């Protein structure tokens, strides 16, 4: 295990390498200035990085990896009526980090972060003290996660999205919205409320977001013609990939095949699926060559089961 400390911010980070894939876990303690970021916002990637540099890293020139990703996610139930939130992360490169936040600065949450977005490479762990890069900002950009109330969120690319730009709202980097929601939302309704309070900007490609809560409610939050729109589940299950769901009855777009495969599989089982079956369904609907991780969150029990690089023989399990 390696540790990183920032005495000025009273931050302690503990990182452990779990496998040579590589896969790491991180426990993050202390104030990472996220609330300050929400008050200030950022209008571009350069502006965002400047805030991180000033508030946390205090070093210039920390690029964020250009990394497009195409993913799939769904919400269903198991036979015990536990709510399952499942997602694939498919992208060109990934260094997955299991992140825990267990302090007074936010709701407790468990999430997966792609450290490649934060300029990590496979040598960063061994040179952590001398090469901080953007490690201190890890908790700003979870790709998916669950908090102590059983609320979950995941990001997915939606190339057609157009974000709102209203003069009376603060603008955020779209990759940081999941952190905001994990910090503050207990339910889908609260997530929708918090999301509509801000403008957003993107770097490589815009996003849409799947959200779900322990009561079984789910929705996909999207941005069409500069307005936030919400598509709620019509059944006890819901699916999303990489095209806009709103006002798209033919479900046309990138990821249509994966969307239909998952939807049909869930329909045949009336939305009832075990965690093992959910992982298998994810594995059979990846983008070949881009598969990075498949994760199933149990929103009732607040657990995570995750596999990496299509290796379904090694399931890593975590409890919030």
Predicted regions span which residues?
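A surface/extracellular/periplasmic glyco- and lipid-processing/surface-interacting theme
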Residues: 153-154, 160-283, 288-291
């Amino acid at each position: 295990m390696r540790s990183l400390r920032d005495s000025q911010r009273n931050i302690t980070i503990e990182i452990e390498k779990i496998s040579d894939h590589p896969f790491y876990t991180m426990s993050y303690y202390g104030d990472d200035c996220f609330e300050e970021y929400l008050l200030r916002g950022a209008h571009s990637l350069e502006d965002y990085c400047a805030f991180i540099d000033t508030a946390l890293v205090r070093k210039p020139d920390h690029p964020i990896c250009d990394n497009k990703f195409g993913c799939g996610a769904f919400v269903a139930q198991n036979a015990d009526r536990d709510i399952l939130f499942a997602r694939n992360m498919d992208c060109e490169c990934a260094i997955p980090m299991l992140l825990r936040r267990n302090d007074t600065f936010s709701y407790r949450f468990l999430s997966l972060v792609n450290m490649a977005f934060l300029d990590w490479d496979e040598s960063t762990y061994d040179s952590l003290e001398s090469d901080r890069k953007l490690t201190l900002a890890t908790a700003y950009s979870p790709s998916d996660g669950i908090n102590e109330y059983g609320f979950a969120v995941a990001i997915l690319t939606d190339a057609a999205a157009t974000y709102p730009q209203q003069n009376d709202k603060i603008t955020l980097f779209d990759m940081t919205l999941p952190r905001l929601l994990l910090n503050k939302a207990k339910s889908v309704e609260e997530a929708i409320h918090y999301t509509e309070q801000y403008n957003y900007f993107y770097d490589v490609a815009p996003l849409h977001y799947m959200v779900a809560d322990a009561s079984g409610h789910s929705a996909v939050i999207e941005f069409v013609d500069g307005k936030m729109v919400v598509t709620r589940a019509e059944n006890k299950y819901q699916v999303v990939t990489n095209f806009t769901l709103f006002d798209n009855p033919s479900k046309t777009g990138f990821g249509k095949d994966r969307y239909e495969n998952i939807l049909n599989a869930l329909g045949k089982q009336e939305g009832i699926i075990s965690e093992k079956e959910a992982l298998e369904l994810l594995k059979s609907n990846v983008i070949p060559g881009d598969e990075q991780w498949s994760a199933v969150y149990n929103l009732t029990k607040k657990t995570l089961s995750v596999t990496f690089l299509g290796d379904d023989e090694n399931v890593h399990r975590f409890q919030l």
